[in-house]
């Protein structure tokens, strides 16, 4: 998988599931962000539940929103 320039990848835990495949994620540094599932995870029907450990990609332009790119097993 190609690495994207400028994105910040950080680990966190899902706090709550919101409508429209959105999730509130608490990052390892204590911040809470709003995150959605990446397209590949949606394609492969990967389910995310509260208390799952995930990796979130954050854009440097808006650090309050992110994309969930990986769920730990």
Curated annotation (Swiss-Prot):
Matching PROSITE patterns: S1_IF1_TYPE
Subcellular location as annotated: Cytoplasm
Alphabetized InterPro entries for the sequence: NA-bd_OB-fold (IPR012340), RNA-binding_domain_S1_IF1 (IPR006196), TIF_IF1 (IPR004368)
Cleavable signal peptide: none
Pfam families assigned to the protein according to its UniProt record, in alphabetical order: eIF-1a
Family label: Belongs to the IF-1 family.
Subunit composition and interactions: Component of the 30S ribosomal translation pre-initiation complex which assembles on the 30S ribosome in the order IF-2 and IF-3, IF-1 and N-formylmethionyl-tRNA(fMet); mRNA recruitment can occur at any time during PIC assembly.
Protein name: Translation initiation factor IF-1
Species this chain originates from: Clavibacter michiganensis subsp. michiganensis (strain NCPPB 382)
Lineage of source species: Bacteria, Bacillati, Actinomycetota, Actinomycetes, Micrococcales
Gene giving rise to this polypeptide: infA
């Amino acid at each position: 998988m190609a690495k994207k320039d400028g994105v910040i990848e950080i680990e966190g835990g899902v706090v709550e599931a919101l409508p429209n495949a959105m999730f509130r994620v608490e990052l390892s540094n204590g911040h809470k962000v709003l995150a959605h599932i990446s397209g590949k995870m949606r394609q492969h029907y990967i389910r995310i539940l509260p208390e799952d450990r995930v990796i979130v990609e954050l854009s440097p332009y808006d650090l309050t929103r992110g994309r969930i790119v990986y769920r730990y097993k």
